[in-house]
Regions:
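RecB-family 4Fe-4S metal-dependent nuclease core
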Residues: 1-258
């Protein structure tokens, strides 16, 4: 069934678009049926770390207070169940180590968890930039729990290079708002991969920006024309990355929690 009458009035975000790319049926459950999602370990953990970093950058917590806050609030903030004990222990330890080693920012902070709204074509968008800062130009930073890797610069892009390019689309979309507010595009797009204490710094590229704009609008057009809403079933991803899995009949038929 086609739901263009609902979709055409939507306010878009990077996550809404990528939800459709990951699984059209999940998009249907979340944004057409508007089902409420359930807690998941990876998303809970990421949100918790984002909150702590935000509190530090805004001065609500001092550097010395971060580990204590983390330990005191981890269990009540990270509710979802990890796939196994080893993953839980690694994530817990790496988050604590990052907060113990965190360094004061050297650049001028212009915004933290900055809410943005803008238009792309005729489509309304919203988003949140984890950090907007200025050094020799404007930089935008996304805090990531994923252990992404810096670009290899090989002639033939590796799997991790291609994955990085996909993640960069979020920051390229946010760059529209930066241009609208500051009159210039970001100089750098940065991922703060806090679990591995790795900073990935990519220069803004106008061609990649234009390609991202086209990708976003083309995907929205596909969503507007969608009629089948097919599921994309892969057990681990469905179980631990989809907050609608308990309400998805396809996942239950596939085996569910068995």
């Amino acid at each position: 069934m086609n739901y263009s009458h609902i979709i055409d009035d939507m306010t878009w975000s990077y996550s809404r678009i990528t939800t459709y790319e990951d699984c059209p049926y999940r998009f249907y459950l979340k944004y057409i049926k508007k089902l409420k999602g359930e807690p998941l370990f990876f998303s809970d953990y990421g949100s918790f770390m984002h909150l702590i970093i935000q509190k530090y950058l805004t001065g609500e917590l001092t550097r010395e207070e971060l580990p204590t806050y983390y330990l005191a609030n981890f269990r009540k903030s990270v509710i979802g169940k990890a796939p196994n004990l080893a993953i839980f222990q690694n994530y817990f330890r790496q988050g604590l180590e990052y907060l113990r080693n965190i360094q004061p920012p050297e650049d001028e902070i212009l915004g933290v968890e900055k809410e943005i709204s803008f238009t792309l074509g005729e489509k309304k968008f919203i988003g949140y930039i984890d950090k907007v800062s200025r050094s020799d130009g404007i930089d935008i930073t996304d805090n990531k729990s994923r252990a992404s890797k810096p670009r290899t610069l090989r002639k033939r892009p590796t799997k991790s290079d291609k994955e990085l390019d996909q993640f960069l689309r979020q920051l390229y979309i946010y760059s529209i708002s930066v241009m609208n507010e500051y009159g210039e595009f970001p100089k750098h797009l940065i991922f703060n991969c806090f679990r591995t204490q790795t900073s990935i710094v990519e220069p803004f590229d106008l061609e990649n920006f234009k390609n991202t704009e086209k990708w976003a609008l083309d995907t929205i057009d596909c969503i507007s024309k969608e009629t089948e809403w097919k599921p994309n079933i892969e057990w681990f991803r469905c179980k631990y990355l989809c907050d609608c899995n308990s309400q998805c009949e396809y996942f239950q038929m596939f085996g569910g929690d068995a």
